[in-house]
Protein backbone atom coordinates (compact mmCIF):
# COMPACT_ATOMS: atom_id res chain seq x y z
CA UNK A 1 0.00 0.00 0.00
CA UNK A 2 1.21 3.46 -0.80
CA UNK A 3 0.28 6.43 1.31
CA UNK A 4 0.14 10.06 0.35
CA UNK A 5 1.25 11.08 3.84
CA UNK A 6 3.58 9.37 6.30
CA UNK A 7 2.13 7.90 9.47
CA UNK A 8 2.33 10.39 12.35
CA UNK A 9 3.99 7.84 14.64
CA UNK A 10 6.74 7.35 12.05
CA UNK A 11 7.57 11.04 11.88
CA UNK A 12 7.24 11.92 15.58
CA UNK A 13 10.94 11.20 16.32
CA UNK A 14 11.92 13.82 13.74
CA UNK A 15 10.73 16.60 16.03
CA UNK A 16 13.79 16.33 18.26
CA UNK A 17 16.15 16.28 15.30
CA UNK A 18 14.46 19.26 13.71
CA UNK A 19 14.72 21.15 16.99
CA UNK A 20 18.50 20.65 16.83
CA UNK A 21 18.60 22.03 13.30
CA UNK A 22 16.46 25.04 14.27
CA UNK A 23 18.63 25.70 17.33
CA UNK A 24 21.90 25.53 15.40
CA UNK A 25 20.58 27.47 12.40
CA UNK A 26 20.92 26.34 8.82
CA UNK A 27 23.47 29.06 7.98
CA UNK A 28 25.76 27.93 10.81
CA UNK A 29 25.34 24.29 9.77
CA UNK A 30 26.27 25.13 6.17
CA UNK A 31 29.26 27.22 7.29
CA UNK A 32 30.62 24.40 9.45
CA UNK A 33 29.95 21.85 6.71
CA UNK A 34 32.01 23.87 4.23
CA UNK A 35 34.77 24.35 6.80
CA UNK A 36 34.87 20.61 7.52
CA UNK A 37 34.96 19.57 3.86
CA UNK A 38 37.56 22.25 3.12
CA UNK A 39 39.70 21.01 6.00
CA UNK A 40 39.34 17.41 4.83
CA UNK A 41 40.47 18.37 1.34
CA UNK A 42 43.53 20.13 2.83
CA UNK A 43 44.35 16.96 4.76
CA UNK A 44 43.95 14.86 1.61
CA UNK A 45 46.36 17.18 -0.22
CA UNK A 46 48.82 16.97 2.68
CA UNK A 47 48.59 13.29 3.64
CA UNK A 48 46.75 11.25 1.02
CA UNK A 49 47.47 12.65 -2.44
CA UNK A 50 50.91 11.02 -2.39
CA UNK A 51 49.11 7.71 -1.74
CA UNK A 52 47.00 7.99 -4.88
CA UNK A 53 43.93 9.75 -3.50
CA UNK A 54 42.41 12.25 -5.92
CA UNK A 55 39.71 14.74 -4.96
CA UNK A 56 36.77 14.86 -7.39
CA UNK A 57 34.66 17.32 -5.39
CA UNK A 58 34.81 20.95 -6.51
CA UNK A 59 36.98 23.04 -4.20
CA UNK A 60 34.89 26.18 -4.53
CA UNK A 61 32.47 26.61 -1.61
CA UNK A 62 29.57 27.60 -3.83
CA UNK A 63 30.00 24.44 -5.94
CA UNK A 64 30.42 21.99 -3.06
CA UNK A 65 27.87 20.20 -0.91
CA UNK A 66 28.48 18.58 2.45
CA UNK A 67 30.66 15.74 1.21
CA UNK A 68 34.00 15.04 -0.45
CA UNK A 69 34.22 12.47 -3.23
CA UNK A 70 37.60 10.84 -3.70
CA UNK A 71 38.97 8.60 -6.42
CA UNK A 72 41.30 5.72 -5.55
CA UNK A 73 42.05 2.33 -7.05
CA UNK A 74 41.24 0.69 -3.67
CA UNK A 75 37.87 2.44 -3.31
CA UNK A 76 35.98 -0.72 -2.35
CA UNK A 77 38.51 -1.45 0.41
CA UNK A 78 38.35 2.15 1.62
CA UNK A 79 34.56 1.83 1.81
CA UNK A 80 34.83 -1.43 3.76
CA UNK A 81 37.37 0.21 6.07
CA UNK A 82 35.17 3.22 6.80
CA UNK A 83 32.08 1.02 7.22
CA UNK A 84 33.95 -1.13 9.75
CA UNK A 85 34.76 1.81 12.01
CA UNK A 86 38.29 2.14 10.55
CA UNK A 87 39.52 -1.32 11.54
CA UNK A 88 42.56 -2.45 9.59
CA UNK A 89 42.85 -6.19 9.11
CA UNK A 90 45.71 -8.07 7.46
CA UNK A 91 43.34 -9.14 4.69
CA UNK A 92 42.20 -5.57 4.04
CA UNK A 93 45.74 -4.17 4.10
CA UNK A 94 46.88 -6.91 1.71
CA UNK A 95 44.04 -6.16 -0.72
CA UNK A 96 44.89 -2.44 -0.65
CA UNK A 97 48.59 -3.11 -1.29
CA UNK A 98 47.75 -5.47 -4.15
CA UNK A 99 45.52 -2.92 -5.87
CA UNK A 100 47.98 -0.09 -5.36
CA UNK A 101 50.87 -2.20 -6.71
CA UNK A 102 48.90 -3.31 -9.77
CA UNK A 103 49.60 -0.09 -11.61
CA UNK A 104 45.98 -0.03 -12.76
CA UNK A 105 44.59 3.51 -12.74
CA UNK A 106 41.46 4.27 -10.76
CA UNK A 107 38.33 4.25 -12.89
CA UNK A 108 34.93 5.87 -12.69
CA UNK A 109 33.69 3.12 -10.34
CA UNK A 110 36.53 3.75 -7.86
CA UNK A 111 34.85 6.62 -6.05
CA UNK A 112 34.16 7.03 -2.34
CA UNK A 113 31.86 9.73 -1.00
CA UNK A 114 32.74 10.87 2.52
CA UNK A 115 30.62 13.26 4.55
CA UNK A 116 30.75 14.69 8.05
CA UNK A 117 27.53 15.79 9.71
CA UNK A 118 28.26 19.24 11.14
CA UNK A 119 25.68 18.73 13.88
CA UNK A 120 27.62 16.02 15.64
CA UNK A 121 31.02 15.54 13.99
CA UNK A 122 34.02 17.57 15.11
CA UNK A 123 37.12 18.76 13.29
CA UNK A 124 39.00 16.13 15.28
CA UNK A 125 36.79 13.50 13.61
CA UNK A 126 37.78 14.91 10.22
CA UNK A 127 41.47 14.77 11.16
CA UNK A 128 41.17 11.21 12.49
CA UNK A 129 39.46 10.09 9.28
CA UNK A 130 42.37 11.40 7.21
CA UNK A 131 44.90 9.88 9.62
CA UNK A 132 43.13 6.50 9.54
CA UNK A 133 43.05 6.54 5.74
CA UNK A 134 46.77 7.36 5.72
CA UNK A 135 47.41 4.30 7.91
CA UNK A 136 45.32 2.11 5.59
CA UNK A 137 46.94 3.30 2.37
CA UNK A 138 50.49 3.83 3.61
CA UNK A 139 53.25 1.34 4.32
Name each model feature, range by range.
Residues 1-8:
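A short glycine-threonine-serine/GTX helix/turn-capping micro-motif
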Residues 9-56:
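Conserved PLP-dependent catalytic core of the aminotransferase class-I/II
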Residues 34-38, 45-86, 95:
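Conserved PLP-binding catalytic core of the aspartate aminotransferase-like
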Residues 81-87, 94-139:
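PLP-dependent enzyme catalytic core of the Aspartate aminotransferase-like
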